[in-house]
């Protein structure tokens, strides 16, 4: 068989060489007529099978068939060979594609609904993170700064370990303990410590995990959670962010049928607790004021344990725990760090230690020094240093006098916090400089004198600008806003005005956060008085601060000039300047002599050859 082009194939048909054609798809086979072939005995006729054949690939058309008829060529059309396997696959392939696409989306939807399995029928299963007995490694020794809360929870641990001691005498352990406190204070850590100390299974779930798109899922998950816990009792169920499902049902505006069904099921399950099973429910929230009263009644959450921000002693203990895994230099004073981190939670302090370790690595040191911790505190409190920010010299002078005014007012105003640091290095998004004040001790109440002293310190930045330059700038915008808020609260919240003495003009919530309510319960005349009284007090305090800084103008100019040269003045240097207030010239001479003495050895060294 010889393969030829289709055009040549047609030419051989036209010449009469091809006398028979078999039409396939898409090929053509042409057979020639049998003709004699030479042999040893002469000529012999070739059979049709032995006759030359031609093979071509082309397209069957009406003109080609007409040509075959005209040439009286015998032709036949060979039926197409059918491959049943391929045909079956061609029919089934689209169906298989649709099936796999449907299965993919069905599994994804079922997974989103249930969070556990690939079946939509598992949507009602609880999405709790169960930790087996003995696998919770957290202990009370890992928790610091909340000693009172630990004492309350130690009783829960004792019940889980020795339940008969309580049941034999007829006592009942609280069925539920609600941990209340601001974010980051260690509520979840305390719950894990209880489970770790008692060596019992620990079931942890978030309040938002109960609510999904299908009605009834929340109640089903509550039932499943308590069923799992009872099977492994004694144990602890911990619900984080309880306010997600426990909001009060009294507010019809924010009512939600699915959330109410979930809450009702939770109340039923808590009523069904058996005091002898050793199953205790712990929950945490930072919004106890929005919880439903039925949830807080005795027999459900019997105890509310306040987990507040730590005091000075607690902050030091927390820092020591987090510093156990960090290489600290011997001279690091964690108590000093605790003193400047007033109001920090346990999570904030952990972040400070971690940031200090990262700063030490960035600087190429093998240990964390005190400077790293100070920088970490300022970074978490104010923001990152912006050393690359370009500030005009005129603006730097305004900032220097502004911050010096804050520092002097904080020093010479009775009741103000002491100055820890002054700097004109920008930080964060808006701080072009700042004066770091720290209280001597933690405060739980604030006197009227201390509030007015804080107002004086806030207004002293603008007052310093006025004393130094005779005009003010927008740099004191945030200070004025904060001072206005303090004075307004003194009048409306604390009853510290002459006309409305001992009268609170605003209502506050009754919960832990005591959020102010938006409703105003006083007249327009009272509002006018409040506005006028705020303006009067601020004007009076501003005049007093201007008088103070005018009296201390020489000291103001000296510290501001020093601040422009060095950019940062620490507490020790600032206090030395204050002590030498009446001998600034002598202080200048001593400082210049110290600088000359420090530079003399460097000048006496011979240059390297």
Curated annotation (Swiss-Prot):
Binding annotation for ATP: 181-188
Q: Catalytic positions? A: 403
* GO terms classed as biological process: protein catabolic process; proteolysis
Free-text cofactor note: Binds 1 zinc ion per subunit.
Q: What is this protein called?
A: ATP-dependent zinc metalloprotease FtsH
Q: Which family does it belong to?
A: In the central section; belongs to the AAA ATPase family.
What function does the entry list?
Acts as a processive, ATP-dependent zinc metallopeptidase for both cytoplasmic and membrane proteins. Plays a role in the quality control of integral membrane proteins.
Q: What is the species listed in this Swiss-Prot or TrEMBL entry?
A: Treponema pallidum (strain Nichols)
Q: Which residues lie on this side of the membrane: Cytoplasmic?
A: 107-609
In which compartments does the protein localize?
Cell inner membrane
Designated gene of the protein: ftsH
For the Periplasmic compartment, the record's topological domain ranges are 1-83
Taxonomy, superkingdom: Bacteria
Q: Name one GO molecular function term.
A: ATP hydrolysis activity
Membrane topology (UniProt):
Single-pass membrane protein
Where is it found, in Gene Ontology cellular component terms? plasma membrane
Pfam family for this entry, one:
AAA_lid_3
UniProt-listed SUPFAM superfamilies: FtsH protease domain-like, P-loop containing nucleoside triphosphate hydrolases
Q: How does it assemble?
A: Homohexamer.
The primary location reported for this protein is membrane
Query: Where Zn(2+) is bound, by residue?
Result: 402, 406, 479
- What is the E.C. number? 3.4.24.-
């Amino acid at each position: 068989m010889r393969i030829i082009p289709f055009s040549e194939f047609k030419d051989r048909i036209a010449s009469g060489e091809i006398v028979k054609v078999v039409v396939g798809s898409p090929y053509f086979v042409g057979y020639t007529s049998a003709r004699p072939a030479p042999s040893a005995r002469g000529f012999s006729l070739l059979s049709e099978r032995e006759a030359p054949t031609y093979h071509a690939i082309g397209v069957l058309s009406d003109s080609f068939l007409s040509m075959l008829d005209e040439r009286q060529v015998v032709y036949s059309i060979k039926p197409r060979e059918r491959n049943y396997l391929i045909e079956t696959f061609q029919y089934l392939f689209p169906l298989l594609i649709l099936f796999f696409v449907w299965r993919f989306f069905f599994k994804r939807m079922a997974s989103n609904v249930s969070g556990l399995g690939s079946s939509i029928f598992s949507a009602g299963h609880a999405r709790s993170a169960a930790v087996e007995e003995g696998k919770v490694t957290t202990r009370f020794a890992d928790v610091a700064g909340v000693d009172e809360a630990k004492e309350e929870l130690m009783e829960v641990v004792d019940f889980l370990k020795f339940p008969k001691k309580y049941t034999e005498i007829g006592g009942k352990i609280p069925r539920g303990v609600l941990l209340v406190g601001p974010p980051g204070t260690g509520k979840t850590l305390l719950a894990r410590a209880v489970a770790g100390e008692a060596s019992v299974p620990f079931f942890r779930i978030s309040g938002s995990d109960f609510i999904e798109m299908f009605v009834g899922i929340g109640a089903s998950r509550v039932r499943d959670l308590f069923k799992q816990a009872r099977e492994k009792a004694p144990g602890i169920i911990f619900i984080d962010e309880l306010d997600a499902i426990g909001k009060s049902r009294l507010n019809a505006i924010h009512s939600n049928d699915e959330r109410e069904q979930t809450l009702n099921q939770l109340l039923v399950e808590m009523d069904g607790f058996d005091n002898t099973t050793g199953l205790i429910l712990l929950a945490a929230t930072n919004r106890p004021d929005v919880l439903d009263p039925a949830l807080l009644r005795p027999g459900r959450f019997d105890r509310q344990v306040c987990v507040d921000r730590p005091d000075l002693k607690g902050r030091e203990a927390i820092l020591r725990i987090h510093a156990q895994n960090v290489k600290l230099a011997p001279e690091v004073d964690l108590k000093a760090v605790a003193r400047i981190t007033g109001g920090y939670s346990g999570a904030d302090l952990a972040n400070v230690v971690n940031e200090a370790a990262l700063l030490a690595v960035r600087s190429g040191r093998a240990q964390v020094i005190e400077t790293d911790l100070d920088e970490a505190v300022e970074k978490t409190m104010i923001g990152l240093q912006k050393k690359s920010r370009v500030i005009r010299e005129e603006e730097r002078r305004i900032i220097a006098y502004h911050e010096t005014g804050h520092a002097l007012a904080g020093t010479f105003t009775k009741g103000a916090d002491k100055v820890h640091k002054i700097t004109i290095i920008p930080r964060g998004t808006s701080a072009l400089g700042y004066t770091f004040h720290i209280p001597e001790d933690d405060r739980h109440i604030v006197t009227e004198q201390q509030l007015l002293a804080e107002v004086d310190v806030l207004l002293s930045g603008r007052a310093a600008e006025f004393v130094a330059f005779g005009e003010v700038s927008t740099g004191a915008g945030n200070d004025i806003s904060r001072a206005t808020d303090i004075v307004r609260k003194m009048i409306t919240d604390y009853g510290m005005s002459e006309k409305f003495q001992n009268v609170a003009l605003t209502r506050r919530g009754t919960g832990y956060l005591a959020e102010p309510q938006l409703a105003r319960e006083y007249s327009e005349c009272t509002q006018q008085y409040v506005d006028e009284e705020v303006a009067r007090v601020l004007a009076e305090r501003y005049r007093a601060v201007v008088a103070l800084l005018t009296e201390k103008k020489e000291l103001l100019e000296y510290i501001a000039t020093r601040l422009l040269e060095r950019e940062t003045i620490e507490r020790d240097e600032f206090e030395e300047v204050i002590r030498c207030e009446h001998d600034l010239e002598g202080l200048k001479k001593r400082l210049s002599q110290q600088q000359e003495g420090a530079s003399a050895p460097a000048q006496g060294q011979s240059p390297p050859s």
